[in-house]
């Protein structure tokens, strides 16, 4: 895993949740972990990792993920045993 992806993962697990994580960095992290990122209708995205799916909407007009999305990702990664 590249240092950029490691920093993104550490930011997701930081407490309290940060709302300054760029959504495209999250997409890159999922791909670096061997997952798949698919864009659905509108701004909906499907993240697939280790046989599990997570649905999120790309924030707009901002490019940063919202805090609740970061918290959901943290819980999903924790369930999949993906940790920094």
Over which residues does each language-model region extend?
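Basic nucleic-acid-binding interfaces
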Residues: 1-84
């Amino acid at each position: 895993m590249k240092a950029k992806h490691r920093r993104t993962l550490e930011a997701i697990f930081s407490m309290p949740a940060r709302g300054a994580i760029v959504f495209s960095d999250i997409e890159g992290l999922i791909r670096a972990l061997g997952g798949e990122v698919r864009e659905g209708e509108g701004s909906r995205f499907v993240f697939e990792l280790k046989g599990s799916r997570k649905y999120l909407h790309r924030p707009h007009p901002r490019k940063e993920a919202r805090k609740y999305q970061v918290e959901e990702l943290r819980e999903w990664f924790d369930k999949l045993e993906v940790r920094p």
